[in-house]
């Protein structure tokens, strides 16, 4: 364990530079830049809430906040694991030239996705603010208590889970490149098995609930 920690500390500046590089590359040609990390989930939550509340008639108080909370966590996991999966193969030329611990690359992708999610959390704060003011949704149904500060706990759980899964996928992808295509299909099914766009009472008492309980993202 000490050896891994020493190696991590040795390459922490490389990790920082790789994360900074990915941030610059992602928003390099964008006028709004990093602001899209806030606007994208905010706009998506508004569109999804309009569609599902008007066409599917889901009776969920403040559906936009319900959706945004779940989608931020799930999208972080999806982005982190998907990018970590191809990170070693994508950096093969660099790995062949100099010695760098291979786990640095999946770790960097997961941390980049985590940083991106932290910026996206601003969208959730904005949505809660406009709901509390009564601009959208129902302020009476929005009860904000001190327990909101515990939100970082599921975030950290998801971070550790994403890192572990990302490392496994990155190793498998080196030998079996088709795993990327299979994983994209799996994550789509995974999303629908996670109560993000529908309330739990829709599936309670059905066979689907038994499958959903096996889903780590459900908890």
Regions found by a protein language model. Give the residues of each.
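Hydrophobic transmembrane alpha-helices and immediately adjacent juxtamembrane helices
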Residues: 1-219
